[in-house]
Amino acid sequence: MTVTKTNLNRHLDWFFRESPQKIENVTSPIKTLDFVKVKVSSSDIVVKDSIPHKSKNVFDDFDDGYAIDLTEEHQSSSLNNLKWKDVEGPNILKPIKKIAVPASESEEDFDDVDEEMLRAAEMEVFQSCQPLAVNTADTTVSHSTSSSNVPRSLNKIHDPSRFIKDNDVENRIHVSSASKVASISNTSKPNPIVSENPISATSVSIEIPIKPKELSNNLPFPRLNNNNTNNNNDNNAIEKRDSASPTPSSVSSQISIDFSTWPHQNLLQYLDILRDEKSEISDRIIEVMERYPFSSRFKEWIPKRDILSQKISSVLEVLSNNNNSNNNNGNNGTVPNAKTFFTPPSSITQQVPFPSTIIPESTVKENSTRPYVNSHLVANDKITATPFHSEAVVSPLQSNIRNSDIAEFDEFDIDDADFTFNTTDPINDESGASSDVVVIDDEEDDIENRPLNQALKASKAAVSNASLLQSSSLDRPLLGEMKDKNHKVLMPSLDDPMLSYPWSKEVLGCLKHKFHLKGFRKNQLEAINGTLSGKDVFILMPTGGGKSLCYQLPAVIEGGASRGVTLVISPLLSLMQDQLDHLRKLNIPSLPLSGEQPADERRQVISFLMAKNVLVKLLYVTPEGLASNGAITRVLKSLYERKLLARIVIDEAHCVSHWGHDFRPDYKQLGLLRDRYQGIPFMALTATANEIVKKDIINTLRMENCLELKSSFNRPNLFYEIKPKKDLYTELYRFISNGHLHESGIIYCLSRTSCEQVAAKLRNDYGLKAWHYHAGLEKVERQRIQNEWQSGSYKIIVATIAFGMGVDKGDVRFVIHHSFPKSLEGYYQETGRAGRDGKPAHCIMFYSYKDHVTFQKLIMSGDGDAETKERQRQMLRQVIQFCENKTDCRRKQVLAYFGENFDKVHCRKGCDICCEEATYIKQDMTEFSLQAIKLLKSISGKATLLQLMDIFRGSKSAKIVENGWDRLEGAGVGKLLNRGDSERLFHHLVSEGVFVEKVEANRRGFVSAYVVPGRQTIINSVLAGKRRIILDVKESSSKPDTSSRSLSRSKTLPALREYQLKSTTASVDCSIGTREVDEIYDSQMPPVKPSLIHSRNKIDLEELSGQKFMSEYEIDVMTRCLKDLKLLRSNLMAIDDSRVSSYFTDSVLLSMAKKLPRNVKELKEIHGVSNEKAVNLGPKFLQVIQKFIDEKEQNLEGTELDPSLQSLDTDYPIDTNALSLDHEQGFSDDSDSVYEPSSPIEEGDEEVDGQRKDILNFMNSQSLTQTGSVPKRKSTSYTRPSKSYRHKRGSTSYSRKRKYSTSQKDSRKTSKSANTSFIHPMVKQNYR
């Protein structure tokens, strides 16, 4: 017997009552789970026993070997042997009548009932119910036995006289098929209901389940008739009448439901049911399609889902009409003139049985207990076959609840975990993150209209003999302090110290009416009060925590210690534009000042800021523009002198720190603003900073004694997983196709070429909706792809790591790293772009140790001193340690890096380690490590880490035998270990500093990493036995010899904080914070042939690092250009049948690919290019090079460097005097001067109103990045107008090609300041 939508509730009830052990050998009739239900203020409270936690997917509890089977293919379920004649009906229906199921009918017949007809009968009763008083158990609601009082829609279908006998004590209207009966009971007893509009014209009674006797006697509700003397006779009568019932298919098409006559509250309840059923059917369809692709069972659910969609549309239309009408009927919000019917298509209802009316348990509980709820959040909840009743409330009865009733009500088990609050996104940060929420209760919220809240308020009032709480009051909490799984909810009080500031009422008003939010998340209110008090504030919040609101809301407050313009320094134009778009929708005057704007727009912005009445609230600039632009400096000076500079905000503040993973030199100069604008409060915000980075930010920005606010970094909805990088595309497709085909995701790659290859492979070979996104694309194309992805046309975006920082998309369900990231900070930030809506999301990293060579090459070719590069290597080693760790919880490792203690018990299988069932033990690998050290010492020449490991394992490869390495002492010792443990051992020795990998380039420009001994002090500690090398190995792995000792599995995690070079699996500390730069060799242990190891090909290194810094993008361009140049050379050689010497050698082509000469003259400057070859062969090769020159120029067009403010030729700030304290610019040296804000602008002034209108109109027309509709580009060539900034500087060429020619040349002349970023600042923000 297969579980279906119609009988799933029976199976669930029976399954949780009987254990799996009882299922197989069941011989007695199965007793279903009792449902105990009582009505309190017309809200159904359901209490059940032995029901799993509601957040758990009920399908997870089913065992394939026992009862439940969801497909047609598997017919081994033990339920196949059960007979429904032995199954007792649910006790919930006993007071009136059980659903009689003929014993002769099969389960398949039971599934074929026309559920639409049953729903119509039920809903006819539902809509005919006026808002009633609360009905207790043991009493039946009744009005008349006359058949003329039967609902009209049922009279159209059935003749009640065929079923009703005048002398029956209980009369019923039966709508039945061959295998199922729906009964609507009527009694002849009078109705003792207290109501203003009692129902007297309807011969219908409502089936209400029994409440236990001990409670029902105390509640002041009418009673149900519990006379069951005629039950047996009625059952027999029902079975006899089945044959006389019309078939479902013959009547389905005649049923139409007039939703316009329903009470408003009933419509809301019914809408929740429809949405829940549609969601469940959709989940079922997707599950069957993906898990059982050869089954066609899902097809029968598609028409059901379509009918539900039509019903939802009909109900929403009525609700919309109700909202637009003047309804004074309380909860009975009907629209007499609105005729909105739903008639199910006969073709559909005849083919497919409609699902039964079943209500998820959580929906019943939510509708009766939750102050604020979204029905769509209910998914995969346990469902129960619960008849639906009106939730309308008659308020006079609320005051009749007595103290004894309250005590008995408290016996019900209402789990705090069932209270959920849908928190609205506080500006760019999606809802649902694990953070605290302060919910503001006011008269316009619908919280107070929930029946259970009113009952609870009345109950508390009865106990305390106090009056009911008023819905408009902020003085007391409604339900006090409540906790659920994700949020700690605090109702604010005006007596609360956080709301006792002079500006508190203005803050609450702006939150509601300006930003349309209902509350604050954790630390938001504290940050707002801090900055409005004139304090410096440092905010550390995870992605999705609501950082932007902390400075956007204070910007519109007039009552703070400072008022005027809030200066926001943001690193990315896309991030700026995203916030500006949101502020524009809120009508908050906010403007950018960037080189991306046309000159006339920049002049307009400056005019708004220099006006007498400055109405601009937020001004967004980039750090590069602030450091190099005199115009911005003059504007800020004017605002400061007029007391109109409110605060300075540094977004993404981790860019300030040298220790940060994304250091920007221009951010380092922001500390000078402290001297220039004395008395102005600073605010620094970041989502990724450990303790060292935080202290560096505070010291650099001179924010001593600032208010520090830190939220938890934990993202409980993210699942972390690391997979080996083997059979990558198969693994990618397997993951995406297993439940993620229709979901949005990001795949991060290391280079632009990888992005294109991965996207093309997934799109062409696997049919996935994937597209690449990177800086090599034209700006218009990038905008189009991003918009298509955000709208859902593309499900997967394959991009480089910068993508996603400025993208506001909360429903990203997975983030995949094609290669491991450069730091744990970067990993946390990139994975944080998934699941910002609070729903579960998956984070996967494909790990291969050899990928680190690419990062080593970038570090080697990058700018910065030895200390800077060593810090980069430290961050890289930490990522390797994180990936190699097989025992410690992933979440715990990440949070430990940020200095947050986390118990892995709370991970709840939220990572691959916690889901791992394998047993790991600690193995002492010190003896093996000593043999590896001796082996490396005895090797003459260069060897990679892989070659050293092969020698250690006794490999007999040709190169090893040729060099005689197989005869060295220690060769073959590692045979006792399996290869996986050997690899992890050598990687562990590298992370511990015992071995060091030295990256070098060969003559052809290819980079290799050769292994050499590390610091002598570390090696000596291992040789002396002071440092033990401990490795986690699977218990089934090959064991070392008896000399190794086994340790118990570690229960603690060594800290990752403070950049200590320690292994997460080792028991030793190796602090790097106080360590000097490693010397590769020490005099106490000289290499056998140091000249060979130290030797470098200096010419090749100079060729490779002719520029002191080459970004990842530039290396990618160089590689592709070199490939095309070699291809051209091969074609020319084939035509002329000549040798390489007749053309350009590989080294010459490499220089051409790096320098990208534009003409023959520049080509001649390359070493090895003769005049003859330059003239004869140069034009052909220059045509290939020109393509890459154009690409780089297009890429520079979207950079955040402001070309119109100084020059595109500057990568770093050259005019450092722009931030100096010179008296000529009018700044005072008086450090004791007090900065006082200006007076607020008076509202109502015509000039002010006109200027505000001009600013808002300008905001709607400004074109920083054109995030709206993407314009069509007429031509790829572009010519600047004659009044461009280059014309003012006397440039002789205005063509776009010429515009970037100087930039192309001078970009090689980078500053000598340390830059720890792997990606060049000029191209970083668009290198996606």
Swiss-Prot record:
Record's signal peptide: none
Primary site of residence: nucleus
Null allele phenotype: Increased sensitivity to UV light.
Any one GO biological process: recombinational repair
Binding sites annotated in the UniProt record for ATP: A555, V556, I557, E558, G559, G560, A561, S562
Motif mapping: DEAH box: 651-654
Comp. bias (Polar residues): 1260-1269
InterPro entries named in the record: DEAD/DEAH_box_helicase_dom (IPR011545), DNA/RNA_helicase_DEAH_CS (IPR002464), DNA_helicase_ATP-dep_RecQ (IPR004589), Helicase_ATP-bd (IPR014001), Helicase_C-like (IPR001650), HRDC-like_sf (IPR010997), HRDC_dom (IPR002121), HRDC_dom_sf (IPR044876)
Gene3D superfamilies (alphabetical): HRDC domain (1.10.150.80), P-loop containing nucleotide triphosphate hydrolases (3.40.50.300), Winged helix-like DNA-binding domain superfamily/Winged helix DNA-binding domain (1.10.10.10)
Enzyme class: isomerase
Effect caused by changing K547 to A/R: Loss of helicase activity
GO annotation, cellular component aspect: chromosome; cytoplasm; nuclear chromosome; nuclear replication fork; nucleolus; nucleus; RecQ family helicase-topoisomerase III complex; site of double-strand break
Catalytic activity, as annotated: Couples ATP hydrolysis with the unwinding of duplex DNA by translocating in the 3'-5' direction; ATP + H2O = ADP + phosphate + H(+)
Domain Helicase C-terminal: 728-876
Phenotypic consequence of T543I: In rad12; loss of helicase activity
Subcellular location as annotated: Nucleus
Location of the region described as Disordered in the Swiss-Prot/TrEMBL record: 217-254, 1224-1247, 1260-1328
Record's function text: ATP-dependent 3'-5' DNA-helicase. Has a role in the repair of UV-induced DNA damage in G2 via recombination-mediated repair. Also has a role in the repair of infrared-induced double DNA strand breaks.
Family: Belongs to the helicase family. RecQ subfamily.
Protein name: ATP-dependent DNA helicase hus2/rqh1
